[in-house]
Amino acid sequence: MCGIVAAVTQRNIIDFLLEGIKKLEYRGYDSSGLAIINKNQNIVRIRCVGRVNKLLKKVKKKKLFSNIGLAHTRWATHGQVSEKNTHPHISSHIAVVHNGVIENNTKLRHFLEKKGYIFYSDTDTEVIAHLLHWEQTKTGESLVEVIQRSKMKLNGNYSMVVMDAYNSSRLIAVRSGSPLVIGLGIKENFIASDQIALLNITKRFIYLEEGDTAIVETKKINIFNKNNLIIKRKEITSNVKYKSINKGKYKHYMEKEIYEQPISIQNTLNNRIKKDTINFSELGDREKKFFLNAEHIQIVACGTSYHAAMVSRYWFESLANIPCDVEIASEFSSRKLAVRKKSVFITLSQSGETADTLAALRISKKLGYLGSLTICNMKGSSLVQESDCYLLTKAGIEIGVASTKSFTTQLTVLLMLIAKITKLKKQKNNIEKKIAQILSLLPSKVEAILKKNTLIKTLANQLCNKKNILFLGRGDQYPIAMEGALKLKEISYIHAEAYPSGELKHGPLALIDKNIPVIITAPKNSLLEKTKKNIKEICARGGIIYVFSDQEIDLEKNMTIIKIPYVEEIIAPILYIIPLQLLAYYIALSKGKNIDQPRHLAKSVTVE
């Protein structure tokens, strides 16, 4: 969602600020702005609605120079999309950019209005700026002291960076539920909501932890924890290559990321599968501590990660013989919970910053779970920091809003984990060896399916003008149908629904006619014959069917079969999503949609 970039240096930082927020465009935004302190110690602010390129043109006309500044991309939560609501927000000598939501902003706004403050925007961010100014005027304290005290009055999950025209040598950063990272330079330092914004200038980072306040200057950084005690945070060296965030030969990031899946899966397997055994060095003794005694698994996630969790439920129960419940994170947090005995709490998230999932994790800590594990793509993320242990997917940077390689690498990690647990609990002989061997071949099998792209392009041309599409799947293919429908909705804006094939007669069959195509995934498994019956039911009612299968299926009228290379049943969910990703991509491409930044959506949803 919103993006923050800030810098304090000994050189002009205007170009850096603009380049930084441009790198954060993938997170989703509707407006952007920046503020700097000029040579007269005044704050200069420039804002606009629309793309960062529009802001760039406005800034270039001003010919600004400054050693300190902050910039922001806004995704509207409080107040409509307008220049007046665009960050940064100013109160006298104080400028603020902010991610997240201040839940008690209305109460604070009324308080400040009574004190004589005039609001020019509808945002909760302007409330922060005026509150800091009021507190400093009242007490005469330094801005750092004011921020440390004032943050206790701000309810909600947020992060902010504050700039003071009366002290132009430093920036102040606060993390309270929303991520911030400090980039370390030589006689210069940087702040961002995502390391991607900083990768072209540094590989050295410090991730602020919950409740931290940081004073960032050119030559030093002081960090205070939630108790306002000075503390040293660990420095991390990123191994992410800057060139990996370029599209290269591909038209869109989503296309690039679909075709990166063989290498992303291979990276996820590397150093974890050796001589037909699976090893997670990250877990250490927690592997036995959590899972040997586990009698239940509770997984929470959102969006694509939720669909990966849904697939894993079938694996947990059929392989490890452990009951598994999967719930959407926002729903988990919204009800009174009855926790099973000896249950392990697992979260899935690409970014590790999904607000709903973080909220669920924080609630779980009070409920008596054996422990918490997160499966995540970002090592320094909040979920990684706040969980008892973590497993990284190693998918690499994913920029397209519609997740692709994070889904298949999540499933890869989950299947390895379940194989380890199955062996640990002595449920099935040789299951670890079998799955290790199958997964070792997975990257090449993904490559084989990607070679079907010409067929899928043709299919996309047939479907691109449809208003509604129905996806069906049985067993562990039902979550794949859900993910296929989600991908199509996200980037093509075609209405798509997914149902278990067995539910067809319980309502969805009423929708079947020649205008609603039905897409079915039908790998060889024990449910294939039942799926064939569903196909006949649809054809008998004049439906149009497209079947992805590795088996020969008798052709019916108005039926198209897209042949998929044979795959082992256990990894069919990982492989059958690939053609559905391609299908969604090529349909959106033919419709001319903004594939990497679909309307109203953000890559990392950091507000509840």
Curated annotation (Swiss-Prot):
InterPro entries: GATase_2_dom (IPR017932), GFAT (IPR005855), GFAT_N (IPR047084), GlmS/AgaS_SIS (IPR035466), GlmS/FrlB_SIS (IPR035490), Ntn_hydrolases_N (IPR029055), SIS_dom (IPR001347), SIS_dom_sf (IPR046348)
Chief localisation class: cytoplasm
One CC-aspect GO term: cytosol
EC number from the UniProt entry: 2.6.1.16
PANTHER family: GLUCOSAMINE--FRUCTOSE-6-PHOSPHATE AMINOTRANSFERASE, ISOMERIZING, GLUTAMINE--FRUCTOSE-6-PHOSPHATE TRANSAMINASE (ISOMERIZING)
Keyword terms of this UniProt record: Aminotransferase, Cytoplasm, Glutamine amidotransferase, Repeat, Transferase
UniProt name for this protein: Glutamine--fructose-6-phosphate aminotransferase [isomerizing]
Active-site residues (renumbered): 2, 603
Boundaries of every SIS domain copy: 287-427, 459-598
Main enzyme class: transferase
Listed GO MF terms: carbohydrate derivative binding; glutamine-fructose-6-phosphate transaminase (isomerizing) activity
